[in-house]
A protein has these predicted regions:
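Noncatalytic linker/hinge segments flanking ATPase motor cores
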Residues: 16-18, 22, 38-46, 76-86, ...
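A conserved FAD-binding loop/helix module that cradles the flavin
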Residues: 43-83, 87-89, 96-98
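Solvent-exposed, non-transmembrane amphipathic alpha-helical segments
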Residues: 12, 57-60, 80, 87, ...
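FAD-site-proximal beta/loop scaffold in flavoenzymes
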Residues: 1-58, 69
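C-terminal auxiliary extensions adjacent to catalytic cores
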Residues: 97-163
């Protein structure tokens, strides 16, 4: 079963959406509909960034930086985001695709996120490279969880120091 592909009901009912998704400022993921509201991950119109957990994590870091800077009366440097998606093909065999993203102009003079440094696995890659990609895919989730919950996480420690 594939769930409805839209922003959550709360975002739509709150007037944050245009159609099924929420428009955001690419440099911050701040809503274009409501000041001091940030929308990230699947709910955001993050043209041309894919909707993935990796993307949402990258966006969340930026949103946290903006919220902290706003509370401290500071500014945040230039935005950059990253995405990687892995596909597991068999034990010890995986492929990946990804890119870096920065705010900019897209075709049709639309504001969005412009991809750079794109990468994609190639047909015929050596087994060692596919194994390394497989290992990378499995390392990502524990790394993410460690970043979020680690006691020595500098970002979390800084946030606790302000409370």
């Amino acid at each position: 079963i594939i769930p409805p592909q839209t922003a959550g009901r709360i975002a739509i009912d709150s007037g944050l959406a245009e159609g099924d998704w929420c428009p955001v400022k690419p440099e911050s993921f701040q809503s274009t509909k409501a000041e001091h509201v940030y929308v990230l991950g699947d709910a955001a119109i993050a043209i041309d960034m894919p909707k993935s957990a990796y993307s949402a994590h990258s966006q969340a870091i930026r949103v946290a930086d903006h919220i902290v800077a706003d509370l401290e009366g500071k500014t945040v440097g230039d935005a950059s985001y990253r995405n990687t998606c892995w596909s597991l093909l068999a034990p010890d065999d995986a492929i990946k695709i990804g890119a870096d993203y920065t705010p900019g102009r897209l075709p049709g003079n639309r504001e969005g996120l412009v991809a750079s440094n794109a990468f994609v696995s190639k047909p015929g890659e050596p087994a060692e490279e596919r194994k390394a990609t497989f290992d990378e895919a499995f390392a990502w989730y524990p790394t993410l969880i460690s970043e979020i919950f680690a006691k020595d996480n500098a970002r979390a420690g800084a946030a606790k120091g302000r409370s």
